[in-house]
Amino acid sequence: MKRILCLTLFVVLFGAPAIAATNKAKQSGSTGTGEIGFGVGQSDVNSDTAGIDSAQYIGIRGGYHLNNQWQIEGQLSSSSDSGDISGTSVDTTMRLLMVNGVMNFHPKKKELVPYVMAGIGRADVSVDAAGTSASDNSVAYQIGGGTRVFFGKSKTMAFRADLSLLRDSSFDDSTTLTTVTAGITWKLGGR
């Protein structure tokens, strides 16, 4: 019940500015556009129960620009690695499904777009060791920041790099992942 209340509060607090931003964008004549991309990276895992201390990351993201500054983004990603706990081989995989609110900044250099983001979603964790497997899921929270560097004549493709901190509590243990990612993103629509 506590998680549902927190999720509802999060949606209300971040939903109101997003709706207001959309109405302002409609009045000013700017239209919403999309963005899609992928990234790869490395996660530093802070957990005693996962059996690993780092993991490889791969993910895809898709977003909708409410206006020039605000964006709603969906993220689907997976981190996995193998490690040893007391001589037993352990394979750990974490799959994430997140919804992020992104605030973009637009300095004078138009090809550079730094951003900060915060998100909430679901973490599914599975651990396989010595023929035995266990899985759990939990609510996950994420904050981060990074930049997009647009290139090419039309400036619709960008290199994206970011740093994020993700927290979940699967297997009754709080885990923090610090992830550095790099990837490519494309603008969709007439922005």
Segments from the language model and where they lie:
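N-terminal targeting signals for Sec/Tat export/insertion, comprising classic cleavable signal peptides
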Residues: 31-61
